[in-house]
Amino acid sequence: MLDDRKLDVLKAIVTDYVSSKEPVGSKALVERHGLRVSPATVRNDMAVLEEEGYITHPHTSAGRIPTDKGYRLFVDRIATLKPLSAPERRAIQAFMTGAVDLDDIVRRTVRLLAQITHQVAIMQYPVATTGTIRHLELVSLSTDRILIVLIMSSGSVEQQIVELPGHDEQSLAALRTRLNETLVGLTVAEAADSLNRFLDDLGPAEGPRAASVIATVLEILAVDPSARVVVAGVPNLTAFGAQWETAVRPVLEALEEQVVLMRLLGEATAGEAGEVTVRIGAENTDVPFQSTSLVASTYGPEDALSSLGVVGPIRMDYPSTMAAVRAVARYVGRFLAEG
């Protein structure tokens, strides 16, 4: 069990190493942090910390750097979350207020999180709750193709192009009207049932073309938007420095895999709703992310939680990053709830 002085030394080492990227020596710690003990005493404390596995020394350097275990202790017992500044809070509110629909909210949120933290931000699409269909639009693109646009009460917009040879504007308008009369105000489950009944009632003349449209609408309704993850701030991977082949390239490749990102966020936020969680190094089960840290939180109503977070180097400013993730998660949750 480490006493308070050794915890103070570890905190000072983590703080200095994160800001300077250089190994930290005992003399510098005493001078910068007012530890009120001699460098010799600090060296003894550092020796204990190293023996316990909380710090190590790279190569022949006289300075020390934190290990993953050291960062873990720092996050769990030492770190104090830094509240966002008033300008940062105002910037979040202003940035979110301009959003026009759900897709825009997600894009703005993930970009904002990347900008605030200077890390790679990842965000799961909101989990659908009891949203209903607001409108269905059928747009003729050519003589043999149309665009189907489905707008939900949540603001989400799904669209898909379908081949529809031989259609005309009059029949398309009639089908659009009938489908909106059938679907508007229904939940996804209710809409699927209604569309299946709609198919049964089609006449022989309109059947084939309408069936093609309805089949596509059913496909759109079956898609779960919350299985999508949006990424922003990939250029921030330069924070890894020269570790391209060993760290950055595998992370870059993994960021392209939606299933991997969903698993990463899901495992990190499996605990209590609304809490900020931190996964450090090998605590991440996916190998490419074992050279990184993940700071994540949930957002949204308790019965439909989604996740967001940031990925960055293990040498991370945890207090600031955790505060930013918590603040953005709360803001986007409130913003979505207010509609």
From Swiss-Prot:
Q: Give the superkingdom in one word.
A: Bacteria
Record GO biological process = negative regulation of DNA-templated transcription
Q: Which InterPro entries match?
A: DeoR_HTH, GAF-like_dom_sf, HrcA, HrcA_C, WH-like_DNA-bd_sf, WH_DNA-bd_sf, WHTH_transcript_rep_HrcA_IDD
Task: Read off the Pfam families from this record.
Answer: HrcA, HTH_DeoR
Q: Which GO molecular-function terms appear in the entry?
A: DNA binding; DNA-binding transcription factor activity
Q: Which UniProt keywords apply?
A: Repressor, Stress response, Transcription, Transcription regulation
Give a short account of what the protein does: Negative regulator of class I heat shock genes (grpE-dnaK-dnaJ and groELS operons). Prevents heat-shock induction of these operons.
Q: Report the sequence similarity comment from the record.
A: Belongs to the HrcA family.
Which PANTHER family does the UniProt record give? HEAT-INDUCIBLE TRANSCRIPTION REPRESSOR HRCA
Protein name (Swiss-Prot/TrEMBL): Heat-inducible transcription repressor HrcA
Source organism? Cutibacterium acnes (strain DSM 16379 / KPA171202)
Recorded name of the encoding gene? hrcA
